[in-house]
Amino acid sequence: MLNRTILVGRLTRDPELRTTQSGVNVASFTLAVNRTFTNAQGEREADFINIIVFKKQAENVNKYLSKGSLAGVDGRLQTRNYENKEGQRVYVTEVIADSIQFLEPKNSNDTQQDLYQQQVQQTRGQSQYSNNKPVKDNPFANANGPIEIDDNDLPF
């Protein structure tokens, strides 16, 4: 059987970090995920999905994500239930995240922004190292059209 959920969306609120009685960090947040179709008014609707993440990833989510951040979530769907104060059974469906991808840099964190800028500079061929050796050019930069590769050239 398979229970796998992959989502990309924006946080609707800042993550909430707490620690269980056994000392495990848990973060929760809601992800707004646009539907692939439009409604009768031509507007795209969204689903608001509760996400739970544990341990070190919970700390990272709390540190680097905030309301409006774009994130990718890979996890599994889980339904739990409890009895509320009125004695009614309440069912809650949420995604238990195995992996969270931060899909954009956090602007309020200068360190993260600096890292992003370094990555951008490196992709433009500017070295961050002080040895001033030239960066080798991309050997495929001037390739026009498809590259012919024989099956015998492949290592697998």
From Swiss-Prot:
The keyword DNA-binding applies. Residues 107-156 are annotated as: Disordered. Residues 112-128 have a biased composition (Low complexity). Residues 1-104 form the SSB domain. Keywords: DNA-binding. One of its GO terms (cellular component) is nucleoid. It comes from the Bacteria. GO terms for molecular function: single-stranded DNA binding. HAMAP family: SSB. This is Single-stranded DNA-binding protein. The lineage of its organism: Bacteria, Bacillati, Bacillota, Bacilli, Bacillales.
